[in-house]
Structure formats: C-alpha cells, structure tokens
C-alpha cells in the first residue's frame, strides 16, 4: 500500500482525523505502516483507544479502498491527499488539515482568505440551502 492510499483509508475510518493520523504516522514511521498492526500495537499509540485500535486493525482496507476509488471515479471526483502535489498549500499548513479532499471539476488556486463548507456527504436540506446562499 502506498502512503497516499493509506491516507485515504485512514480518512475513511471513523475517529481518525489529522491529530490521530499524525500520532499513528509518527509511531510507525509512515501511514502505510499502520496497516497490518495488531489492535494491541495500535492501542499503545497515544490517543488511540481500544475501540479505535480495533476498528483500524479489523478494517477491510483493500476492499474499502477499491470501492471508494471506484465510487469517486464514477462520480468524476478526484481524491487529493496530503501527499498530492495539487493539495492546496493554504490547507496543508493548517494545524488540523483535512487528510483528503474530494474534488469535482477544477480546483482553482485558493486565496489566503477563503470560506470552505465542511461536513458530511449527506447534507440536510437546510445545509444545502445555506451552502447555496453563500456561493
């Protein structure tokens, strides 16, 4: 597994954000080195509790990664990770940047001052109305 792929998989696991991703990467040397570890090994990492360690250790990453990449491809979406050249520098330098960005269409250069809408994939009707009102 490439580090880029590991980043996508870790992003898919509930409870893993940038802070826990960083702890795992530092503990094992790279994002790809996280996989294949036992729940016990994972649990020894600061901030990784028993439940999260179990989710990571038992995650069917090959199947889930293939499904995610296929779904993105069918939707015309590119997945940008922290490892990709196209990942915006303005986000890369945040304290807690998103591990992945799902981009449809062209991603213009981001200005220093910008607004982003961050949320779940299934937004509510209210969330959709509010998003449209600021664009």
What are these regions (language model features)?
Residues 1-133:
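Short, positively charged patches
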């Amino acid at each position: 597994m490439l580090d880029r792929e590991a980043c996508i998989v870790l992003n898919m696991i509930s409870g893993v954000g940038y802070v826990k991703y960083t702890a795992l990467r530092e503990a094992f040397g790279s994002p790809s080195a996280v996989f294949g570890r036992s729940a016990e090994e994972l649990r020894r990492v600061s901030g990784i509790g028993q439940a999260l360690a179990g989710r990571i250790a038992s995650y069917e990453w090959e199947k889930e990664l293939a499904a995610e990449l296929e779904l993105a491809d069918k939707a015309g979406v590119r997945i940008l990770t922290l490892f990709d050249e196209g990942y915006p520098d303005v986000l890369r330098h945040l304290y807690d940047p998103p591990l992945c960005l799902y981009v449809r269409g062209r991603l213009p250069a981001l200005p220093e001052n910008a607004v982003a809408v961050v949320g779940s994939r299934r937004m509510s009707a209210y969330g959709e109305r509010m998003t449209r009102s600021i664009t």
